């Protein structure tokens, strides 16, 4: 009887002990899981924080400085004068942004191919470098409202003016700057034309003047300015492709800065600010004739520019439809 009682007591004690061990194990596992979960959440938060390369509007204001990417060699849009000061149409606008924001401006010299990269890495807060709005670029950066109209153009020597791209021979080259809409447009629509690409405006200009290419394709505002300032050259193709716009750009997702810039552009439009900008920086190059064509006030593209773009789109659609109809007719004739 005593032996049986002792066995029962030992069995009960052992069961309780094993239960306590099991509970301790569960508690330990639960604690480990909780700690792991907290670590994971902290890592995710840290990763998310690290992925934000841009500075918000408030952060810029708190720092007292803003970094704006501009060209340093593209007169009259962005260039450094003989006194080492930044000047030009884009710079005039940038100075106004800094003034109204109440911060110091740090100008950062950029090339066409670096504009997206500088925003993606947070090297600059805004790009104001003759930046044409395109769907491809809009996937990587956020564009604000436009402040200028633009199309593509082609300049060539007066002795051999290129008035149509079909005049370019198979062994001849067209000069473009890497990262520009001219490069993208020609590669997509004229893949047979050989392109000589350069990273900077200065090297492209020098190469063109040395006869490396039979023509230079760029924004029409730039090639027109080039032909006016350099004797012996003519813009044989003043408008190529569709009518586009120039706009400021910020890092993808920087909504606070983007909204402020849009509001600023709308407010400046009420003052005809961009006409004043044109007359201060561009009129010596283009004269009064181009002012209404190029300037966009308050982020609103004029009806004339919109109509021109619409007309070009309609013409392209009509040409495409005619071509398709002719092709269908040929196939039908062959079938007979």
Place the predicted regions along the sequence by residue.
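A ligand-binding cleft/hinge motif common to bilobed small-molecule-binding domains
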Residues: 131-139, 187-188, 202, 209-210, ...
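Bacterial lipoprotein signal-peptidase II cleavage site
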Residues: 22-37
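Periplasmic-binding protein-like
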Residues: 149-156, 224-265, 284-304
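Extracytoplasmic small-molecule ligand-binding "clamshell" domains
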Residues: 34, 39, 46-130
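Acidic, polar ligand-binding/catalytic clefts
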Residues: 95, 99, 104-168, 240
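Short helix-initiation/N-cap motifs at beta->coil->alpha
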Residues: 106-118, 178, 196-210
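Ligand-binding clefts/hinges and TM-proximal coupling segments of bilobed small-molecule sensing domains
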Residues: 49-51, 181-198, 235-239, 265-310
């Amino acid at each position: 009887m005593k032996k049986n009682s002792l066995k029962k007591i030992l069995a009960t004690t052992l069961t309780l002990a094993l239960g306590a061990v099991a509970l301790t194990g569960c508690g330990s596992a639960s604690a480990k899981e909780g700690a792991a979960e907290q670590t994971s959440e902290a890592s995710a938060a840290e990763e998310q924080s690290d992925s934000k390369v841009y500075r918000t509007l408030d952060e810029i204001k708190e720092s007292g400085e803003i970094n704006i990417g501009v060209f340093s060699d593209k007169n009259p849009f962005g260039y450094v004068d003989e006194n080492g000061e930044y000047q030009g149409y884009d710079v005039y606008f940038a100075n106004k942004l800094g003034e109204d924001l109440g911060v110091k401006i740090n100008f950062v010299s950029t090339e066409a191919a670096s504009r997206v990269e500088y925003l993606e890495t947070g090297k600059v807060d805004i790009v104001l470098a003759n930046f044409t709005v395109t769907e491809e670029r809009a996937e990587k950066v956020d564009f604000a409202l436009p402040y200028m109209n633009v199309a593509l153009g082609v300049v060539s020597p007066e002795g051999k003016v290129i008035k149509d791209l079909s005049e370019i021979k198979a062994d001849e080259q067209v000069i473009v700057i890497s990262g520009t809409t001219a490069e993208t447009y020609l590669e997509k629509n004229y893949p047979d034309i050989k392109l000589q690409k350069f990273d900077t405006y200065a090297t492209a200009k020098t190469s063109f003047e040395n006869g490396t290419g039979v023509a230079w394709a760029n924004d029409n505002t730039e090639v027109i300015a080039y032909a006016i300032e350099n004797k012996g050259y003519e813009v044989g193709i003043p408008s190529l492709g569709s009518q586009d716009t120039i706009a400021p750009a910020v890092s993808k997702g920087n909504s606070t800065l983007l909204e402020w810039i849009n509001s600023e552009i709308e407010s400046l439009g009420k003052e005809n600010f961009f006409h004043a900008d044109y007359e201060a920086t561009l009129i010596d190059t283009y004269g009064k004739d181009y002012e209404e064509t190029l300037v966009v006030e308050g982020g609103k593209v004029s009806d004339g520019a919109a109509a021109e773009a619409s007309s070009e789109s309609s013409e392209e659609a009509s040409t495409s439809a005619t071509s398709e109809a002719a092709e269908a007719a040929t196939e039908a004739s062959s079938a007979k």
